[in-house]
Amino acid sequence: MSRSNGVIDAWLQRQWYAEAQPPWGLRALSRGFGAAVALRRGYYRRNAKVSLGVPVIVVGNLSVGGTGKTPLVIALVELLRQHGWSPGVVSRGYRGSARAPLEVFCGSDPAEVGDEPLLIRQRTGGPVFVSPRRVEAARAVLAAGADVVVSDDGLQHYALPRDVEIAVVDGVRRYGNGRLLPAGPLREPVERLASVDFVVCNGGEPGPGESVMTLEGRTAVRLADGERRPLAAFAGQRIVAMAGIGHPARFFSHLAALGLNFEPVAWPDHHAYSPDDFRSVPEDTPVLITEKDAVKCRRLDDPRIWYIPVSARLDPAFAPRLLNILERFRHGQTTA
């Protein structure tokens, strides 16, 4: 993302999460966007969708920016495996250059496949395919042996059939000013949540009926050699913390809650890291980054860089509900 785009994004974020009313021009564009969203969803609801013959779980959100979808997808893959399923993941591959269904490997180029799909493959080791056409990616993942499809960030991709919809909500920022793009952060109206199967609240206070998810990460891993160190070991040191994710404040808050003192550096989401980003950091100063950023920094070979793996801990009631839905599918009962 260019510097000018980063400035625009920061300005929009201020509009979306401020109490003041956004400018009239943004509100007018928002009404047009809302009409287009309604037409598109109506079209796909009226027209029959292709059946994939296996259950499809869609994980997404209403808001643009990071809400914690990727850790949840990883947790879902692990949960499904524990209960005898063979999950495969499909994604558009944000900012990736792939146009046809492309399998993601642990050594894939994030510029080609996207950083989230690459992280999912590295963490789970299971089949991950990316394509702007998720139905094609789903067929590819089924051919690779999957018997359940998990779609990363596919809530608004209505061409893809789905049996379970999971919407992730930022429990602190919630829905901002509650407006649709570009006047607000929403891709769809809040009322859309009434039709999903699960609303998962990441941090903050959950609303009625929402499942709770917390992200846990107390260990740092040196990018250059894999050395692991408790984050508490960095207490009292001079530290730089960098994040090029949708909501960097969450990462910084996590470090602060662990008692670390650091200089925060926020980059635009999906920032492409280069050695220049670290030139101003003193040679003896550790740099803490997110696990998602780490997939784009592996070629830098900089011993100062440490990343923090996080894992999603889910509400105890979540797994039985999800598995019950999938078991009905296994016994020939669709969830539609």
Curated annotation (Swiss-Prot):
- List the catalysed reactions: a lipid A disaccharide + ATP = a lipid IVA + ADP + H(+)
* Keywords assigned: ATP-binding, Kinase, Lipid A biosynthesis, Lipid biosynthesis, Lipid metabolism, Nucleotide-binding, Transferase
Its annotated function is as follows: Transfers the gamma-phosphate of ATP to the 4'-position of a tetraacyldisaccharide 1-phosphate intermediate (termed DS-1-P) to form tetraacyldisaccharide 1,4'-bis-phosphate (lipid IVA).
Looking at its record, which EC class is this enzyme? transferase
- Supply the EC number(s): 2.7.1.130
User: What is the organism lineage in this UniProt record?
Assistant: Bacteria, Pseudomonadati, Pseudomonadota, Gammaproteobacteria, Methylococcales
**SUPFAM superfamilies linked:** P-loop containing nucleoside triphosphate hydrolases (SSF52540)
Q: Which GO terms describe its cellular component?
A: plasma membrane
Quick one: which residues bind ATP? S63, V64, G65, G66, T67, G68, K69, T70
Which GO BP terms, alphabetically? lipid A biosynthetic process; lipopolysaccharide core region biosynthetic process
Q: Which GO terms describe its molecular function?
A: ATP binding; tetraacyldisaccharide 4'-kinase activity
Q: In which pathway does it act?
A: Glycolipid biosynthesis; lipid IV(A) biosynthesis; lipid IV(A) from (3R)-3-hydroxytetradecanoyl-[acyl-carrier-protein] and UDP-N-acetyl-alpha-D-glucosamine: step 6/6
Similarity annotation: Belongs to the LpxK family.
Spell out the Pfam families in the cross-references: LpxK (PF02606)
* The protein's name in its UniProt record: Tetraacyldisaccharide 4'-kinase
Which species is this UniProt entry from? Answer: Methylococcus capsulatus (strain ATCC 33009 / NCIMB 11132 / Bath)
Coiled coil location: none
